[in-house]
């Protein structure tokens, strides 16, 4: 989220305070004054050690809608997700686990996790992304 494509690029990170709440936080990354990424963090607790890793209901998902500047056509979603909000194992980013015991910390593709998800921007510049409770999504945009 915080990286820039080359040393001479100008990177600006913005917290979207007006859109954020107690349970969601939103950030944008602009590279050379162009929107490059949107970060969505869901802060709800789910399946935590406080309730012995048992939540009585399926993991809720929130849909977030965005309207992009002209020229943005598509994007890809990379997700940070685990079985619960305070999990120490089973954590993946964009479908890969970086657990040391799998390949000494190198990314290993997990068969049961989505990778390289695409979003389509409609003709009005809008798109939606679903974010499960206690997870994060980075939408990298083609603008």
Where do the language-model regions lie?
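Acidic, Ser/Thr/Pro-rich beta/coil linker or hinge segments at domain junctions
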Residues: 53-131
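Carbohydrate-binding surface patches
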Residues: 20-71, 79-84, 137
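Catalytic cores of secreted or luminal carbohydrate-active enzymes
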Residues: 1-22
